[in-house]
Every structure is written in structure tokens, then in C-alpha cells.
């Protein structure tokens, strides 16, 4: 999926996160994380983000994640929503999408 415009998904409520994505000028994946649990779970959050981007076919993006203790499934869902919005797609074939284990 190609990121065409900036987009957001999520909230700053407890146990949620807000994810923003925008096109990368240098065709790389850049993930910036701010989290209340970064010391304990920062590496896992980054891993989930990278795997979700890979599953969506995103090869170039600047992503900001502001996490307030969200579970992995919430992080994945917020990334999916932000990427779909930024890609300006109207329909997505969820039947062929591989979710995180």
C-alpha cells in the first residue's frame, strides 16, 4: 500500500494509542514511539508496528505512535486504520490479510 497523505487513528485515552502516518520523503520506514510503558514494552510495540506494516505491504512511511498502554491488537488496529485512510482506499480485502498471532 502506498501512503498518499497524512492520516490519524486512535485516541489518547488510557489503554489506547494514537497513530499518525505520512509519506516518507526518503522511501524508508521510520517509527517514532512515545509511550507510558516504553521501557517495559517499547521493543514489542515497534515489532508489532513493523509486522503490521509488512502485512499491509507498506514499504515507505513516517509513523508516530503515542501509546497509553494499548494491547497489541489495539496497536495493530490503529495502524491498519491510519494506513487505510492515508492510502485513500475505499475497500480492503480482509479475507487475504494476515493478522498478528
Curated annotation (Swiss-Prot):
One of its GO terms (cellular component) is cytoplasm. The gene is citD. It is found in: Cytoplasm. It comes from the Bacteria. Oligomer with a subunit composition of (alpha,beta,gamma)6. InterPro entries: CitD (IPR006495), Mal_deCO2ase/Cit_lyase_ACP (IPR023439). Keywords: Cytoplasm, Phosphoprotein. Covalent carrier of the coenzyme of citrate lyase. This is Citrate lyase acyl carrier protein. Belongs to the CitD family. Its main location: cytoplasm. Coiled coil: none annotated. The modification O-(phosphoribosyl dephospho-coenzyme A)serine is found at residue 14. It holds the Pfam family ACP.
